[in-house]
Regions:
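Conserved beta-strand in the GNAT
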Residues: 58-60, 66-75, 87, 92
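Conserved acetyl-CoA-binding loop-helix of GNAT-fold acetyltransferases
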Residues: 93, 99-112, 135, 139
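A short, polar/charged loop-to-alpha-helix boundary motif
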Residues: 78-84
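Conserved N-terminal entry element of GNAT/NAT acetyltransferase domains
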Residues: 1-18, 22, 157
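Conserved GNAT acetyl-CoA-binding A-motif
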Residues: 107, 114-125
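Short loop/turn motifs at secondary-structure junctions and domain boundaries
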Residues: 49-54
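Conserved GNAT-fold acetyl-CoA-binding loop/helix
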Residues: 25-48
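Conserved active-site alpha-helix within GNAT-family acetyltransferase domains
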Residues: 104, 128-147, 151-154
Length: 157
């Protein structure tokens, strides 16, 4: 079996940027995304935004020369622990690489990175009906918050 490799995203690297857009589009096309392709021009806006977002950190799961998976994350700060934390905003595995351990690989490697850099926790959100993702997250040691939290939003667009 070929070895999986973790690569930190470099938003100044054009190959990385193309791979980010490609992988996000896979997510958008998925039933757990929006079920349709990325809007025209959205890829460039995403890359521009990531390049200008000082708290962005990303991780690719690669095999040979292929970008198989992506975790788009943000660094945040826990005032309760007085330490930084990682929020996983997107976790995407390309359709051709699903059910091959890339999701668990990324989560495990992000945890190693967080421990090595003295982060206090990793958090993420998951749709209530995304049972495959929930199973993966539980396998990686994640659990619902106790007490259970709600994720709320106020759309400004």
């Amino acid at each position: 079996m070929k070895a999986k490799e973790l690569i930190m995203v470099d938003v100044q690297n054009e190959e990385h940027c193309r791979s980010i857009v490609k992988l996000i589009n896979y997510y958008m096309l998925d039933e757990m995304g929006q079920g349709e392709s990325m809007r025209e021009g959205m890829g460039a806006k995403i890359i521009h935004g990531l390049r200008n977002h000082s708290c962005y950190i990303g991780f690719f799961g690669c095999i040979e020369n292929d970008y198989a998976a992506l975790a788009n994350c943000n660094i945040n700060f826990s005032t309760w622990q007085a330490k930084p934390l990682i929020n996983i905003h997107d976790l995407i595995v390309a359709p051709a690489y699903r059910n091959q351990g890339f999701g668990l690989f990324l989560l495990t490697e992000i945890e190693k990175y967080a421990r090595e850099n003295d982060y206090c926790r990793i958090n993420l959100e998951v749709r209530h009906d995304n049972y495959k993702a929930q199973k993966l997250y539980q396998k990686a040691g994640f659990s619902a918050c106790n007490p259970e939290n709600y994720f709320w939003e106020k759309l400004l667009l």
